[in-house]
Amino acid sequence: MPLRPTVRLVLAVSLDGRLAFPGGGPAQLGGAGDRQVLEQALAWADGCLMGAGTLRAHHCTCLIRESGLLEERAKAQRSPQPTACVVSRSATPTFPEEWPFFQQPLERWLLHGEEAAAPSAAPAGFSQCLAMGTTWQETLAQLAAQGMQRLVLLGGASLAASCLRDDAVDDLQLTLTPRVVGGEHSWVPFDAAGLPPALASSDAWILQGAERLQDDELVVRYQRRLPP
């Protein structure tokens, strides 16, 4: 088993790199083509990482709906949906149990900050509650010990930045949507500090492919070049 899972950051962004419209709210820039490649990524994954703020914005997570993908997971004796891993500073976050998230047919784990006191039991609606390590490399090693080998990172921007800061993102899957929306909601926050200089190198990422989708969307896939 690998020392840590492979992490794939999957986002739909505008041509100017925004995740959402200037007014904020749920990130809903992608269309039908983006939905298709998103489900393909979910079908690849054992789990998906999402920030508590993203859950509060959407009240749910993405599910695999395409029958062929569900059949492939069933044949491989995998659960129909990847485990939803919600990342929160608090070990006892307040998420209303009436949100659709808690009725969705998947397993839910809570990953909380190491400084938070661990609860005696997982909060309502979650089957596991795990304390994160001091770095993402440590946290991912813990998830590998739980059987996670492939993770999709769904955002939001702060969570993506924290993983990039620890150089813990292996693959990028970005759907470019034909919009220029402006505003402050970039997929990497403008005030994100401490990103490794190596990520800015011209050879940091290897292009794996690009595919035109419906409605003039384009998905591009990059892989992190491993250091020598």
Predicted ranges, named:
Residues 1-228:
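Enzymes that bind and transform nitrogen-containing heteroaromatic metabolites
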